[in-house]
Amino acid sequence: TFEPIQERTEWAYKKSLLNEYNDSESNILSVANNQRILHDFVFGRDLEFENLPIQKRPKTYFPHRTKTTLRYSFENEQIIALNQQIEIDLTLEFNAVVAIFEAKNGTLKDFNIYQIYHPFLYYYSSNLPLQNIICCYLLRNENSLKFFAYTFEKPLQLDSIKFLKSKEYILRKD
């Protein structure tokens, strides 16, 4: 059994764009993190974004899986993927821009486009007032992190992928 609650605090909760968009266990962690409740509970009061309303703060949504039906095209072929399972490693949201992440360990030469396209299409089809969706691959090696960003110029076309930018962060151990 859990121990009794030692303290109760009323917390001003302001719903954000993707809060409660899915009902996964990781989403509630995301909401608690984005509302800075996790920080308050573990570390005490958070002053980093004290002067910004919660809607203006960057938000993190942890890994989750969901199922949905996706409709799109590849070259001239129409595709309907019924009850398609989608796994999203991480989602960031800031000012109506959503960045989805697919993370891999090791050195890869290429990737499966579906790993970023299906999450892209999931958010694109959500009817949420999003301004932009950025798809990111993160490759982790022993001493570096490599990031690659893409989007889709024609959201309903799998083959409209567009490279945006890349950057490697070399991790220096001091």
Can you describe what each PLM-predicted range is?
Residues 1-114, 118-174:
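Charged, terminal alpha-helix-loop-beta segments
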